[in-house]
């Protein structure tokens, strides 16, 4: 499809900013929170990450679509696209990857995902950095022909991400098992708050049988699996609404079951230990974010995707009903809390994504740390 064949599209922000471009993917209208990712690769993993539910993603990479779409890199069940919409500067007209099965645009049309191209993504990102993530909408085709004042009102009418309880919308409805690659050494119950498929895969490589359960599954219900450890995954929405999961994690900590959390799981553990959360101005979304481990002094380059964070400071220590706890990791860009743990080591979590997909593997040994924790707890 040539530029002349594409219909008009507009990106409308709730604060009144409007960016005109061209439609790609499905035609129509979509609403969500406008956020940006600085990742230069891995758009398929980004778009299928359930943590992006109800978000319109602005890509800072100047051209998107070069590697097409394959059947291997999706991070959700059925390769479902979770982003509400995609905003890009330039759509690649050629697909160049030996694994590609179809183009990005073909997949977006198949899954009815609305996109806009030909916009100044640098200007959009500067606006979001200056004024923060904001409610937005993409309108294309006939939908783009409505008066701009009406489109702005439509965008303003959508629910805020602050206070949004979204985990139940992306979580599995039934428990399922991911078997290890070889002999099962241990069993881990993983709470699916929006889990990425690469997480159970990392457990499998380490001899872990992973039982993935729906969000908010009562702690007493997971006893039937006789778990050697409990994991809480990444996911979308405001952690301040996750009171049920906070209570569940507190029960698990009281039972002294080894615990590991990623992203949303980090915020849940923090809240279970008495910390508070807040909505960030524009969040962290990219695959090159530096994080300092204050326990080792080492720096990891990490993959991140979060718009909420825990309140706290580097090396802060505090008392909890489960023993002393401390802040273990912070972001070198802005000092955001990136990890917390019980001092006894029985529970720990990080805000970033050691499973990557896409991104660097610096933090992948955190999965080994969990296996070692389980081993030590069995003795």
Curated annotation (Swiss-Prot):
SUPFAM superfamilies linked: Carbamoyl phosphate synthetase, small subunit N-terminal domain, Class I glutamine amidotransferase-like
Keyword NADP: no
EC number in record: 6.3.5.5
InterPro entries linked to this entry: Anth_synth/Amidotransfase, CarbamoylP_synth_ssu, CarbamoylP_synth_ssu_N, CarbP_synth_ssu_N_sf, Class_I_gatase-like, CPSase_GATase1, GATASE
Domain Glutamine amidotransferase type-1: 185-379
Pathway: Amino-acid biosynthesis; L-arginine biosynthesis; carbamoyl phosphate from bicarbonate: step 1/1; Pyrimidine metabolism; UMP biosynthesis via de novo pathway; (S)-dihydroorotate from bicarbonate: step 1/3
Binding of L-glutamine, residues: 51, 235, 237, 264, 267, 305, 307-308
Alphabetical keyword list: Amino-acid biosynthesis, Arginine biosynthesis, ATP-binding, Glutamine amidotransferase, Ligase, Nucleotide-binding, Pyrimidine biosynthesis
Catalysed reactions, as listed in the record: hydrogencarbonate + L-glutamine + 2 ATP + H2O = carbamoyl phosphate + L-glutamate + 2 ADP + phosphate + 2 H(+)
GO MF, one example: ATP binding
One BP annotation, GO: L-arginine biosynthetic process
Region (CPSase): 1-183
Stored Pfam families: CPSase_sm_chain, GATase
Entry similarity comment: Belongs to the CarA family.
Function: Small subunit of the glutamine-dependent carbamoyl phosphate synthetase (CPSase). CPSase catalyzes the formation of carbamoyl phosphate from the ammonia moiety of glutamine, carbonate, and phosphate donated by ATP, constituting the first step of 2 biosynthetic pathways, one leading to arginine and/or urea and the other to pyrimidine nucleotides. The small subunit (glutamine amidotransferase) binds and cleaves glutamine to supply the large subunit with the substrate ammonia.
Subunit structure: Composed of two chains; the small (or glutamine) chain promotes the hydrolysis of glutamine to ammonia, which is used by the large (or ammonia) chain to synthesize carbamoyl phosphate. Tetramer of heterodimers (alpha,beta)4.
Protein name: Carbamoyl phosphate synthase small chain
């Amino acid at each position: 499809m040539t530029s002349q064949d594409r219909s008009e599209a507009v990106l409308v922000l709730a604060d009144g900013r409007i960016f005109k471009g061209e439609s790609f993917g499905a035609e129509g209208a979509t609403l969500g929170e406008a956020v940006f990712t600085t990742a230069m690769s891995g758009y398929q993993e980004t778009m299928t990450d359930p943590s992006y539910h109800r978000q319109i993603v602005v890509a800072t990479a100047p051209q998107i679509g070069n590697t097409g779409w394959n059947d291997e890199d999706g991070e959700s069940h059925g390769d479902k696209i979770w982003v509400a919409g995609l905003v890009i500067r330039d759509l690649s007209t050629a697909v160049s990857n030996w694994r590609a099965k179809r183009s990005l645009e073909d997949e977006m049309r198949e899954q009815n995902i609305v996109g806009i191209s030909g916009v100044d993504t640098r200007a959009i990102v500067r606006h979001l950095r200056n004024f923060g993530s904001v409610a937005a909408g993409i309108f294309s085709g006939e939908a783009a022909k409505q008066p701009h004042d009406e489109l702005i009102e439509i965008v303003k009418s959508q629910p805020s991400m602050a206070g949004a309880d979204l985990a139940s919308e992306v979580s599995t409805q039934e428990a399922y098992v991911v078997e290890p690659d070889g002999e099962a050494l241990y069993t881990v119950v993983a709470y699916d708050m929006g889990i990425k498929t690469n997480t159970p895969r990392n457990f499998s490589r380490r001899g872990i049988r992973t039982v993935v359960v729906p969000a908010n599954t009562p702690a007493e219900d997971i006893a039937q699996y006789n778990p050697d450890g409990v994991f809480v995954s990444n996911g979308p929405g405001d952690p301040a609404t996750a009171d049920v999961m906070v209570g569940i994690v507190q029960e698990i900590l009281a039972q002294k079951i080894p615990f590991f959390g990623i992203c949303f799981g980090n915020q849940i553990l923090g809240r279970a230990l008495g910390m508070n959360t807040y909505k960030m101005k524009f969040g962290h979304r990219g695959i090159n974010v530096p994080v300092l481990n204050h326990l080792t002094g080492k720096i990891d380059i990490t993959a991140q995707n979060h718009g909420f964070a825990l309140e706290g400071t580097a090396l802060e220590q505090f008392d909890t009903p489960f023993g002393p706890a401390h802040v273990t990791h912070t972001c070198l860009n802005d000092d955001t809390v990136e990890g917390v743990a019980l001092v006894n080591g029985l529970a720990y979590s990080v805000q970033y994504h050691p499973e990557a997909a896409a991104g660097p593997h610096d933090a992948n040994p955190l999965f080994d740390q969990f296996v070692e924790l389980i081993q030590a707890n069995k003795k």
